[in-house]
Amino acid sequence: MPGRTRRDGGSESGGKDRRDRRDGGRGGAAQEKTPQFERVVTINRVAKVVKGGRRFSFTALVVVGDGDGMVGVGYGKAKEVPAAIAKGVEEAKKNFFRVPRLGGTITHPVQGEDAAGVVLLRPASAGTGVIAGGPVRAVLECAGVHDVLSKSLGSDNPINIVHATVAALKQLQRPEEVAARRGLPLEDVAPAFMLRARAGQGA
């Protein structure tokens, strides 16, 4: 009887401890995670021809961002779609970069190119919204850009468009950086809407 009591007691306490550790682990991970946006741009099925036939796998292009200036793009490949998306998310997190913004728009017009993809981005006034197609919109929304005009001038391949958009965003610079590099006052290089906003705040 004492032996059985020890076994029962041990299993109950051990199971409770294991449940507590699992719950605590999940809770801790949830608290550490920062809010993020994930957009799956495209999923493709890939066939590899081998001696015994064809083997299929899936690729996923994923955009991840915090909606506050940080964004990254990842490409995942696996035998199942969820696994491919998960790999894409992990790679996107490793490729995070910061996008300079003024309010909810970009700092200046810019054009990005990657392979045959060409994307043009222009600042827009507040309330305009994201005027962009699917792949470009996914990147801009995840980056926290709410007002922007865009146009795709090259390939319609979603992968090329996404990478061209990223190339364009990486070219953005803040007016303060441009003024310091050129040795000019901020008023000479800052966009008009930025100066008007500052004047309104000063008044």
Curated annotation (Swiss-Prot):
The protein's job, in short, is: With S4 and S12 plays an important role in translational accuracy. Located at the back of the 30S subunit body where it stabilizes the conformation of the head with respect to the body.
Q: List the disulfide bonds.
A: none
The identity of this protein, by name, is Small ribosomal subunit protein uS5
Keyword RNA-binding attached: yes
GO function terms (MF aspect): rRNA binding; structural constituent of ribosome
Subunit description:
Part of the 30S ribosomal subunit. Contacts proteins S4 and S8.
Which gene underlies this protein? rpsE
* UniProt comment concerning the protein's domains: The N-terminal domain interacts with the head of the 30S subunit; the C-terminal domain interacts with the body and contacts protein S4. The interaction surface between S4 and S5 is involved in control of translational fidelity.
Q: Looking at the keywords, is Amino-acid biosynthesis present? A: no
In terms of superkingdom, the source organism counts as Bacteria
Record-stated family? Belongs to the universal ribosomal protein uS5 family.
Q: Name one GO biological process term.
A: translation
Where's the S5 DRBM domain? 36-99
Keywords in alphabetical order, please: Ribonucleoprotein, Ribosomal protein, RNA-binding, rRNA-binding
Gene Ontology CC terms: small ribosomal subunit
State the residue spans of region: Disordered: 1-36
Species source reads Saccharopolyspora erythraea (strain ATCC 11635 / DSM 40517 / JCM 4748 / NBRC 13426 / NCIMB 8594 / NRRL 2338)
Q: Compositional bias (Basic and acidic residues) spans?
A: 1-25
